[in-house]
């Protein structure tokens, strides 16, 4: 099922969000082949204040311009750095300050790519926008559904779950029907400068810097004790914000007397006492949760939760779908899983699915332990 093509009687104008990567480049090519009137837009969402382009913005803009020149379309540029700071980055810092582990890409999609960019494109006279995300859309019964991308290794519906159906209805996702090797082959065939460009990874505004070094620029470190589940102090941490549930690397502990050689993992971030609770073993019981709570769910389209509903969910990107029961509670929503879930992390997102349909999701606020609380 392809994204809808324009009728012969109506040439629709589409503005593609050109990131300087291969996916958006090929999206523009495919839309041109489908008969759309295509233009590109490069958005800059971060202002470097130290003279170094950590987000490779200059290089990405040059690549986007080279692709647009090659295929003969106009490239607009827009600076959404102020919107990004106000609506994404400040929230990112607040979450870390509160001891949670946020995902800024999800907020960026909701507030920037499918809000600021969409509004700007409509102001330029576009009928639709397009992005290089690996997702699909389907119009059915007067609503627009968000579907998983066909390539399970690249499906990005997890990151778009907070975008509403009205915004999805105004967006085309040309590469959502394809697998990554096909996308690169199309780019090669058309001689695009981005054909062999590596996929971007990590958070754009951090770039190649160490994450801890970046955070220290904005949040003061608050050192505290690292303790075992029995309460023994075995080390010091530089700040809870630098650690996440299930983390193994970078704890600075090991070789302890009377301890086994099993690796140590972060089990709990005790905010009240500024303590990091750790335990040994990848399958430590404290790492597993049976349920989670979220106070607010962003639905692509509203769903009926008048009674508990069997769905599947992901608590992290690229996780396989996990069967669960979702119910509305007085304080929000509770998802109970059929199987124990490892390293459910407050601040991250839980995303719900009904088969290939991405229904929506919310921020995890509480992870309920698989073992009884009195054992913890």
Curated annotation (Swiss-Prot):
GO terms for biological process: tRNA wobble position uridine thiolation. Pfam families: tRNA_Me_trans, tRNA_Me_trans_C, tRNA_Me_trans_M. ATP binds at residues 17-24, 43, 132. CDD domains: MnmA_TRMU-like (cd01998). Residues 103-105 are annotated as: Interaction with target base in tRNA. Its EC number is 2.8.1.13. GO terms for cellular component: cytoplasm. Keywords: ATP-binding, Cytoplasm, Disulfide bond, Nucleotide-binding, RNA-binding, Transferase, tRNA processing, tRNA-binding. Its main location: cytoplasm. Residues 154-156, 316-317 are annotated as: Interaction with tRNA. One of its GO terms (molecular function) is ATP binding. It catalyses: S-sulfanyl-L-cysteinyl-[protein] + uridine(34) in tRNA + AH2 + ATP = 2-thiouridine(34) in tRNA + L-cysteinyl-[protein] + A + AMP + diphosphate + H(+). Catalyzes the 2-thiolation of uridine at the wobble position (U34) of tRNA, leading to the formation of s(2)U34. This is tRNA-specific 2-thiouridylase MnmA.
């Amino acid at each position: 099922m392809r994204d809808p093509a324009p009728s012969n009687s109506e040439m629709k104008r589409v503005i593609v969000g050109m990131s300087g990567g291969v996916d958006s480049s090929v999206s523009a090519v495919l839309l041109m082949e489908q008969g759309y009137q295509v233009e590109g837009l490069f958005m800059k969402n971060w202002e470097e204040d130290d003279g170094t382009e950590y987000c490779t913005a200059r290089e990405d803009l040059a690549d986007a311009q080279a692709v647009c020149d090659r295929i003969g379309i106009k490239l607009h540029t827009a600076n959404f750095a102020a919107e990004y700071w106000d609506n994404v980055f400040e929230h990112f810092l607040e979450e870390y300050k509160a001891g949670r582990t946020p995902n800024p890409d999800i907020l960026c999609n909701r507030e920037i790519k499918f809000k600021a960019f969409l509004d700007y494109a409509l102001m330029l006279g576009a009928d639709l926008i397009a992005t290089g995300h690996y997702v699909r859309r389907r119009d059915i019964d007067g609503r627009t559904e968000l579907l998983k991308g066909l390539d399970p290794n690249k499906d990005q519906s997890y990151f778009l779950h907070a975008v509403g159906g009205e915004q999805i209805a105004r967006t085309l996702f040309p590469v959502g029907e394809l697998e990554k090797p096909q996308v690169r082959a199309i780019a090669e065939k058309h001689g695009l400068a981005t054909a062999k460009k590596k996929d971007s990874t990590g958070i754009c505004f951090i770039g190649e810097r160490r994450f801890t070094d970046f955070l220290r620029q904005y949040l003061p470190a608050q050192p505290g004790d690292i303790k075992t589940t029995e309460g023994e102090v075995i080390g010091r941490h530089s700040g809870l914000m630098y650690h996440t549930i299930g983390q193994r690397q970078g704890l600075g502990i090991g070789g302890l007397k009377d301890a086994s050689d099993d690796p140590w993992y972060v089990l709990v971030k005790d905010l009240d006492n500024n303590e990091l609770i750790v335990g040994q073993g990848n399958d430590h019981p404290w790492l597993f949760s049976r349920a989670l709570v979220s106070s607010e769910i962003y639905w692509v389209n509203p769903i009926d939760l008048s009674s508990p509903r069997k769905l599947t969910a992901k608590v992290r990107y690229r996780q396989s779908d996990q069967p669960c029961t979702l119910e509305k509670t007085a304080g929000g929503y509770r998802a109970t899983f059929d199987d124990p879930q490892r390293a459910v992390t407050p601040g991250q997102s839980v995303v719900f699915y009904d088969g290939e349909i991405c229904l929506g999701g919310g921020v995890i606020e509480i992870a309920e332990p698989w073992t009884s609380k009195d054992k913890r």
